[in-house]
Amino acid sequence: REPNLTDRTVAALWAPTGGIVCPFNLAIAAGENAIMNGVEFQFETEASSIEKAKDGYIIHTNKGDMETKAIVNAAGLYADVFHNMVSENKIHITARKGEYLFFDKSVGTIFNTTVVPLPGKMGKGIAASYTINGNFFIGPTATDVEDKEGLNTTAEILDKLKEMAASDGYLTRFPLPLNKVITSFAGARAHEDHHEFIVQELEDAPNFFDAAGIESPGLTSSPAIGERLAKIISEKMHLEKKETFNPKRAGFVRFNEISDEEREKLIEENPLYGNVI
């Protein structure tokens, strides 16, 4: 199934139900679907502190105070900050930076599936996969950093990644073509000190619900985390199911994948489609 795997491979676990998704489009789609169903987003609003109140919480922000009966803490790298504002049972989250190398589409099909090595203490390891647009990539690395906003790539780490990619026998049985690398980027996942996904109501802070320490495989876990939290919250607060909930969100037009006739029709309906980006 994977003829290009390194000759050092002795065994593999195949997950035929696995797949890939664009994480950016998934987040946008979920947000748009939430708006369709009545959610209101408060953009550019920074929560500076949380105060326990008689019937819930008061959230102090740069745009005034907000009163709420419940809080879902899904603040990623900063989930520990908000958790620790209301709970005596403190947690600590470290930013674990991961860096990637992306290759041009001309590299072609190296693997037919996502290939992940044996995991280590820092995570699942440096994997090889594709974007939904067909770009091959390898990553992420794993480096704990102090700056939670530090999403810059580093020459030292990228050099190690390139050295690994150019060698025989890491994941592939031949060196990867480094002249086909078109970009690199970094991201940070929220590593909880005890390697735990914390998905629960806080014992000493009623109606404060954590989704904290969600690192890899957090994206894969997100539907199950959402269902679990929805169940916990609805049972605790005696919520009723919204019968008019619409779970569907229309996809967007992929302009480069449609026919010339379809493009002309879209431009007639909306001239902005005629702007080349």
Name each model feature, range by range:
Residues G18-G19, N275-I277:
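Short, well-ordered beta-strand elements within core beta-sheets of diverse protein domains
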Residues N33, V81, M85, I232, ...:
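Active-site catalytic microenvironments for nucleophilic, acid-base chemistry
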Residues P23, V81, S222:
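Hydrophobic (often cysteine-bearing) scaffold residues that line and stabilize catalytic clefts
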Residues I50-T154, F255-E268:
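Flavin-dependent oxidoreductases
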Residues Q42, V72, F209-A211:
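Hydrophobic/aromatic beta-strand patches that form the interior of the parallel beta-sheet core
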Residues R1-F43, S48-D55, H60, E192:
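Flavin (FAD/FMN) cofactor-binding and adjacent substrate-gating region
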Residues A29, G123, I132-N133, E149-R263, ...:
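C-terminal catalytic lobe of FAD-dependent flavoproteins
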